[in-house]
Amino acid sequence: VLSFAGAIFSHEGRPRYRETPAPTLFMHGDKDKVVPYNKIQLFSKGLFGSKSLARRFRKAGYPYAFFTMQGQTHDVALTGMYHPDEITWFVRRYVFEHHRWQMNAELDELDRLPREAYSKPYATDANK
């Protein structure tokens, strides 16, 4: 599973899995104000973001890789596929080689594309 700035809605408290979930790659901006990076919960209802889900996976022993995209907002939902090396690494290790790892990493893109570049199919000089 590839999750870019995603979350799970639950009306029964924190998410529970009847079966072991597939290995999951989470990528989420820590400044996301659209979908919670962590969680929003009111009584038994809640929206559980990547940080909360990764913590749940860790406690339950499920395989996952969680990239916190430092300083990024919900744009990660649009730019997740701009990280082919991380995605290829995850698919190779977790899916094809069946590694059962749990990984948390912080990714701070020092050469981040300007926001307007995300709306173009590919950010190249030809598209400017």
Q: Which residue stretches match the model-derived regions?
A:
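Conserved alpha/beta-hydrolase "acid-adjacent" motif
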Residues: 33-49, 79
